[in-house]
């Protein structure tokens, strides 16, 4: 399909550098979905609480999205002189086109819609920082992404009308701001919790997969995951958070033997039809930011 125009302004960024970050985004998506076992989520073992998607759908989806990540970076660079609040409007057509390719790759299954939003924001932030010759670090990337989203929660979640979206309904009922709120705040769950936790475990010599699984548990324990709340209401969300917190308090995932706890947690999530997709999206960002 034809790609939407990004900007008439040229960028000084090397194609190889753009492709390097896009490749990291693709690897982040694959790393997350291949990670196993994950409670309630699609992985190499089963489809979790999802009856409409499989591992191969995520592989096809990630490949389709990878082709669009350079466009997010390029737009971030080309719009570097724009006010940050104006950038999101220009990113939307790219995101919608990327989403269309995702749905075509998966025959209509929503595998990575949340990641298109979050990775698209981070890639645009990276492009802006590179164009302005500013350091690209997890902190600068997240703060730049936050500047793109200033006022987003007010605009999109606090609107009162008779046709509430799922996000608006969960915000009004439970105060959950979901992906929008986390982005507008600069991804504090990732920057202040998941990323340092993951890096500390790696520094301690823990196997990278076990470290990621333990980090996923941490995110599940602290994230007000709208994916979980939309399936199980407030009760389902609180149950999942408590279970994750209990496993962490028992020592978390430190050895292969601890995977039995995750397998049991997975069975219980499937029985309750709960899938922590929002936490999975944040895990993708955690791995991505750990590489830069």
Swiss-Prot record:
EC number(s) reported in the record: 2.4.2.52
GO molecular function: ATP binding; triphosphoribosyl-dephospho-CoA synthase activity
One GO BP annotation of this record: prosthetic group biosynthetic process
Pfam family, one: CitG
InterPro entries attached to this UniProt entry: CitG, TriPribosyl-deP-CoA_syn_CitG
Domain of life (superkingdom): Bacteria
Keyword Nucleotide-binding listed: yes
Family statement drawn from the similarity comment of this UniProt entry: Belongs to the CitG/MdcB family.
Its biological purpose: Catalyzes the formation of 2-(5''-triphosphoribosyl)-3'-dephosphocoenzyme-A, the precursor of the prosthetic group of the holo-acyl carrier protein (gamma chain) of citrate lyase, from ATP and dephospho-CoA.
NCBIfam families reported in the protein's UniProt record: citrate_citG (TIGR03125), PRK10096.1 (NF007503)
Protein name as annotated: 2-(5''-triphosphoribosyl)-3'-dephosphocoenzyme-A synthase
Organism, as annotated: Escherichia coli O139:H28 (strain E24377A / ETEC)
Lineage summary: Bacteria, Pseudomonadati, Pseudomonadota, Gammaproteobacteria, Enterobacterales
């Amino acid at each position: 399909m034809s790609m939407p125009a990004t900007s008439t302004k040229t960028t000084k960024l090397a194609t190889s550098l753009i492709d390097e970050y896009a490749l990291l985004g693709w690897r982040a998506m694959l790393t997350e979905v291949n990670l196993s076992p994950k409670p309630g989520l699609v992985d190499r073992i089963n489809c979790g609480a999802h009856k409409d998607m499989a591992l191969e759908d995520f592989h096809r989806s990630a490949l389709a999205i990878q082709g669009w990540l350079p466009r997010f970076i390029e737009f971030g660079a080309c719009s570097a002189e724009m006010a940050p609040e104006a950038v999101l409007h220009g990113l939307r057509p790219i995101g919608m086109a990327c989403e269309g390719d995702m749905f075509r790759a998966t025959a209509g299954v929503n595998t990575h819609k949340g990641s298109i939003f979050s990775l698209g924001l981070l890639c645009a932030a990276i492009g802006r920082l590179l164009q302005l010759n500013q350091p690209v670090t997890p902190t600068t990337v997240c703060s730049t992404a936050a500047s793109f989203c200033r006022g987003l929660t007010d605009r999109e979640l606090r609107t009162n009308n008779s046709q509430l979206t799922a996000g608006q309904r969960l915000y009004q009922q439970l105060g959950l701001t979901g992906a929008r709120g986390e982005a507008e705040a600069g991804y504090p769950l990732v920057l202040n919790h998941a990323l340092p936790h993951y890096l500390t475990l790696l520094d301690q010599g823990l196997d990278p997969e076990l470290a990621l699984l333990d980090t996923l548990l941490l995110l599940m324990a602290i994230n007000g995951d709208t994916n979980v709340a939309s399936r199980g209401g407030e009760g389902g969300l609180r149950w999942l958070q408590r279970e994750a917190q209990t496993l962490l308090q028992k020592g978390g995932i430190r050895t292969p033997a601890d995977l039995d706890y995750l397998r049991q947690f997975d069975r219980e999530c499937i029985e309750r039809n709960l899938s922590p997709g929002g936490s999975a999206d944040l895990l993708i960002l955690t791995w991505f930011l750990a590489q830069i």
